[in-house]
């Protein structure tokens, strides 16, 4: 128990926060700086703007900001070739076979069948 508490304390002390953003490839993404005096760690062009904001060209990239208080904000940009909501008609939207709701129901049915078969064999 003490080891778990110690590991939890270490994880909280490191304070690494993750931010995920999807965007359309080739556009500019406007993000807010997590801390005003942070250090930028990344290899993509970074354009600081007013009001603690910055702009990046949307490509699949990974970068981070290290704040003065030791908190590290890690950003992951995922570029799409087109917008996911663009050109989608309502009648073309269909339910996928492996949606989370379907998988939960299938798992419950499977577990119920396993216990039913086990009781019949005993």
Curated annotation (Swiss-Prot):
UniProt cross-references to SUPFAM superfamilies, sorted A to Z: Accessory protein X4 (ORF8, ORF7a)
Location of the X4e domain: 16-81
Alphabetized UniProt keyword annotations: Disulfide bond, G0/G1 host cell cycle checkpoint dysregulation by virus, Host endoplasmic reticulum, Host Golgi apparatus, Host membrane, Host-virus interaction, Membrane, Modulation of host cell cycle by virus, Signal, Transmembrane, Transmembrane helix, Virion
Sequence motif Di-lysine motif, residues: 118-122
Listed transmembrane segments: 97-117
Membrane-side (Intravirion) residue stretches: 118-122
Cystine residue pairs: 23-58, 35-67
UniProt key word Transmembrane helix: yes
GO process terms (BP): symbiont-mediated perturbation of host cell cycle G0/G1 transition checkpoint; symbiont-mediated perturbation of host cell cycle progression
Pfam family, any one: bCoV_NS7A
Virion surface-side positions: 16-96
Gene Ontology cellular-component terms listed: host cell endoplasmic reticulum membrane; host cell endoplasmic reticulum-Golgi intermediate compartment membrane; host cell Golgi membrane; membrane; virion component
Residues of the signal peptide: 1-15
Entry text on domains: The di-lysine motif confers endoplasmic reticulum localization for type I membrane proteins.
More info: Bat coronavirus rp3 is highly similar to SARS-CoV (SARS-like).
Job of this protein: Non-structural protein which is dispensable for virus replication in cell culture.
Record's protein name: Protein 7a
């Amino acid at each position: 128990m003490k080891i778990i508490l110690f590991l939890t304390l270490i994880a909280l002390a490191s304070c690494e926060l993750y931010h995920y953003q999807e965007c359309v490839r080739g556009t500019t993404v406007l993000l807010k700086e997590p801390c005003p005096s942070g250090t930028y760690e990344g290899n993509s062009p970074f354009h600081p703007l007013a009001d603690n904001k910055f702009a990046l060209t949307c490509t699949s990239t990974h970068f981070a900001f290290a704040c003065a208080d030791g908190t590290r904000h890690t950003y992951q940009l995922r570029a799409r070739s087109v917008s996911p909501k663009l050109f989608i008609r309502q009648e073309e939207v269909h339910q996928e076979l492996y949606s989370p709701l379907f998988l939960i129901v299938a798992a419950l049915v499977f577990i119920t069948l396993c216990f039913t078969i086990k009781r019949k064999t005993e």
